[in-house]
């Protein structure tokens, strides 16, 4: 199943329509169900323009969310309410997916944006947690029985500019934004040696790649990839 997300980011409004159409049609030809969430109008009243520390600035007038506001683990989906996904978006997904046998959960761990440098499932029963945002007290209940790797020691590297200036990465934790290839293999930023050593303790093999410019301008490896073709059956991992 493919769901086109109703992004709250005006600059990305036509992204799915124009950049990814060929990919979506290929998935459709391969048998995927293709759905589109209601397109938001993104009027000014969708946003709070004043400075409100640690609170989401995206309001709840229309359905809005980005794909990385969701962590999917088999039948269970965890939705992060933040600046890139609101509660109305969660309600829409819940009404759509729960009749199909999925279970929807929501969290409000931090307000900034996406979720894929915060909670990173590595394999059934093992999850990487950003310990600067997630603690044993606020850890989502669906991961209660899972083993957890608590980590926030990312190597922060920005990009040098032509005038010898410096542009920091989009997040100090973007190094945790990795792609899980299988239950024992991840692709991650080659600078993240502390994270590689930690993953090795759990039998996770790391494939390091250079990805600095993307991490400065847009996002990490998980941000820049989307695994549409998957093998296996729909299972429950959080019972």
Model regions and ranges:
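The feature marks the mature, well-folded catalytic cores of soluble enzymes
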Residues: 1-239
């Amino acid at each position: 199943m493919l769901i086109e997300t109703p992004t709250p980011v005006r600059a990305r409004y036509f992204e799915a329509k124009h950049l990814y159409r060929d990919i979506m049609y290929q998935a459709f030809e391969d048998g995927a169900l293709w759905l589109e969430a209601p397109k938001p109008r993104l009027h000014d009243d969708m946003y709070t323009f004043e400075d409100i520390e640690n609170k989401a600035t995206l309001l709840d007038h229309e359905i809005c969310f980005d794909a990385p506001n969701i962590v999917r683990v088999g039948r269970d989906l965890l939705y992060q309410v933040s600046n890139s996904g609101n509660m109305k978006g969660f309600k829409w997904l819940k009404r759509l997916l729960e009749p199909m046998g999925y279970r929807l959960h929501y969290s409000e761990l931090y307000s900034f944006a996406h979720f894929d440098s915060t909670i990173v499932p590595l394999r059934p029963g093992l999850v990487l947690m950003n310990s600067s945002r997630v603690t044993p007290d606020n850890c989502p209940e669906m991961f209660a029985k899972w083993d957890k790797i608590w980590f926030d020691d990312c190597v922060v590297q920005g990009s040098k500019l032509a005038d010898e200036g410096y542009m920091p990465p989009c997040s100090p934790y973007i190094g945790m934004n990795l792609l899980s290839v299988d239950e024992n293999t991840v692709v991650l930023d080659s600078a993240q040696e502390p994270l590689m050593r930690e993953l090795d303790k759990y039998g996770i093999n790391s494939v390091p790649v250079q990805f600095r410019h993307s991490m400065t301008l847009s996002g990490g490896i998980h941000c820049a990839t989307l695994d549409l073709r998957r093998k296996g059956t729909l299972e429950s991992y959080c019972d």
